[in-house]
Every structure is written in C-alpha cells, then in structure tokens.
Amino acid sequence: MGKSNQSTQEINSQAQNPLGIAPVGGLIAKFAIPAIISMLVRAMYNIVDQIFIGQGVGMLGNAATNVAFPVTTVATALALLLGIGGASNYNLEMGAGQEKKASGIAGTALSSLAISGLILAVIVLMFLKPLLTLFGATADVMPYAVDYTGITAFGLPFYILSVGGNHVVRADRSPTYSMVCIMIGAIINTILDPLFIFGFGWGIKGAAWATVIGQVASGVLVIVYFCKFRKMYLSGGMLKPKLSYLKVIISLGLASCINQIAMAIVQIVLNNILRYYGANSVYGSDIPIACVGVISKVNMVFMAICIGISQGSQPIWGFNYGAKKYDRVRQAYRYSVTACTVIAAIFFFCFQIFPHQIVGIFGTGSDLYFQFAERYLKIFMFMTFVNGIQPVSSSFFTSIGMAKLGIVMSLTRQVIFLLPLIIIFPLFMGIDGVMYAGPIADAAAFVLAIVFARRELGKMRSAEIV
C-alpha cells in the first residue's frame, strides 16, 4: 500500500510539473534566454578585449591575445571540472537528504578551485615565454603576448573561482546572484578597457589590467556569497579538501573538462600550423594568427547562442525522457534544432556578405590582413548554417542519459575531424588548407550528429507505438 501511494504521488508530481505539460516552445524560450545571456556575457570578456586591443594596439595585439587564449581555455577546463562536478554532486546529495555530505562536497569544490587557480597562475608566470612559444607566438608577437599574459595570469585564481564557483552558487538556488557575478565582471572589463587602453595610453597592458580587475570583482562576489548570503550550511572545516569528495567531483566534471582541454590542444596546434605555413606564404606568420584569433571570437558569439539554446533545452529533454513522454522529447529536439538553424543562417549570411565590416570591428590592418581575414571568414565558416546541430545533439544525448555518446559528439568537430584535417590539408594546399579544413570538419560533424539523432528519435517513436 505504501509503495502504491508513493507511486501515485510520483505520477501526480510528474503530471503537475510544467516541464511535462507546458508548451514546449515556451519552455525552451523560458530556460534558454537566461542561458544565452549568461553565455554571451561570458564571451564578452574575450570579445571586448579583442575589439579594443585591435583598435588601440593593432594586428600584433590581436595575435597576442590569440596566442594567450589557450591559458584561458585551460583555466576554464579546471573551473568546469571542479565547478560542474561540485554542483552536480551537491545536488545529488541534497536530493538524497545528505545535507552534511553535500556541504562538504561544495566546500571541497570551492577550496580546490582557489588552489588550482593559484597553481595555474604560478606555472604560467614561471614558464611564461616557453609556454607562449609552444602556443604559437612569433618573435614580433612575443613582447605583446608576454605583456598581456604576464598580467592576466594574476587574475587566473579569481577567474577560476568565479566561473567554477558560479555553478555552485546556482546549485545553492541562487541563479540570479550567479548571473550578477558574471555580468559585473564583464561590465567592469568593458568600462575599463577603453579607459586603460586609450585614456591612460597603457595599450595591451591596459586591456590585461581591465580583464584582471573584472575577474577579481566576479571572484570576490562569489566569496562574498559564500560568506554572507549562502543558503547551504558551510563551516570553515568543510573548506579543507577531502580526497574522497574530490574523486566524485572529478567524475562528474570530467566530461566538460575534457572538451575544454581538447579545444586548447586544437588552438595550440592551429596556431603553430598558421605560424609555420604562414611564414611560407605571402601573408607571413603574424597575419594568419591575428586573423584566426579575431574570427574565433566572432564565432564565439554564434556558439554562445547555440549552447545557450542547448542548455535551456536540457531539463525539458531529461524530464520528459524520464517520464517516457517521447513525443515531447522529439518535439523539444526539433524546436531546438530549428532555433539554432535559424540563428546559424543569419550568421552565415552575415559572414558571407559583410566579412570586411565584421573584421573591421576588431581594428585595422594592411590590405593583406583584410584579404586573409575575409577569405578565412568566408571559407572556414562556410558551413555555419548547419553548425548548430552538433552542440544541440551533444547536449541532447547527455540529457537523456547517453553521456558517452554526448562526449563523443562534443569532440567530433574540433578533435575527431578538424584536428587531423588542419594537419593534413596544409601539406598539399599550404595555408589555404587550414581554411578548407573547417567546412569539411563541420559537414562531417553535422552528418554524424544527424545519423545518431535520427536513430535515437526513431527508437523513441517505436517505443511510443509499442
């Protein structure tokens, strides 16, 4: 009888949950819009720097930020490893009624974020020039890269704490505070960039200090939250890292971390290929590195929107899949894919019609600079109109419990297809090979995503019939 009552309560709970009954399109908009805003604000850190550095310092400044970007990617990997892993385990333990264990996991995650940030900052400062050489810096770019990275390294502990800690803040039922933390840092960076670069004449060092101050502000707000406003129970002793907690944190954060590390590897390999083959072309090494840095930031805006749509769809996919409402799962997937495809089409036409204007936002350069940048934007991003399918499908598989396939899907474009192609194609086509590797990798990732998605959606349709 007890089990029957419990089952009835679960059914009633499912029936009343908006995720299972509200119109799917409205639900996606409700969840996706805040996620898109959060992703765009986070992307603005790098984009704003790139714009003002391009306008105030020039092409070599843009190249320097591109060379330095793997440091940020690795820092993000650590933040997601500990932040997502900590937040996920916190929610699981709270759901199981283990409040003390949940708080201990949160404490271990927070202290580990701070420690990992300090360690990464020390490593970057100790091995600054060798790392920048590894990341693709040329002799002309190196002074700018040293100035920029040597300063931004001091902000790494606060950056990692803010990015990772915000996941724990959201898990503590404070999503608005989490969004404010991110936005405050981005706003401060946006205000200080032109002041420091142009007003004080500090050049690329000014951009670096603006970034650090913004990161410190976000990090301090996270610290203030857990000192003053937290809802969870968290004593000082819980901040001492425990190995047993760290293991479970890493287990759930590893997928996101691997994806970021893979991106860092692709960035490093790409920079070095551009440096080598650029030196053997009319463009030289610096122009390709600078241009690719600019265009990667442009692409970040597009990807932020698609990832935001994916994140907004995750609870809808997961809840309805668990409730066996497969028609709503398929409908939510179609809506998400359609939304991303519409956005992708808009970006595609902008890339093809207005390449000069887009590149010009990030500063001026020689005729060769614009020639390479415009060709790269039009060719490398030619398959943009299907590029929203892969991130949506990756999140889709993860949300319905197919985590391994989700990880594979997330790695298809950058690692499985793009990485070998940017190594092989230039052997036969020189620097142009890098450009053509992009659309081929995009097309292959798109086809693979569609094949697996159709297969899984077909299984759901069959299950409904049965």
PLM features: what roles do these ranges have?
Residues M1-A32, Y90-P157, G199-L254, W317-M383, ...:
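Short alpha-helical transmembrane segments in multi-pass integral membrane proteins
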Residues L19-I51, Q55-G56, P70-G85, N89, ...:
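N-terminal transmembrane alpha-helices
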Residues K30-D49, I151, S162, G185, ...:
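Transmembrane helical elements of multi-pass membrane transporters/channels
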Residues A35, M39, I51, Q55, ...:
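Transmembrane alpha-helix boundary and packing residues in multipass membrane permease domains
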Residues L40, M44-N62, L132-A139, L195-G201, ...:
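Helix-terminus/linker motif at the lipid-water interface of multi-pass membrane proteins
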Residues N62-V122, Y159-S178, N271, I289-P355, ...:
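Small-residue-rich hydrophobic transmembrane alpha-helices
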Residues G83, T152-R170, S178-N189, A207-V220, ...:
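Short runs within selected transmembrane alpha-helices of multi-pass transporters and secretion channels
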Residues F417-P426:
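Transmembrane alpha-helical segments of integral membrane proteins
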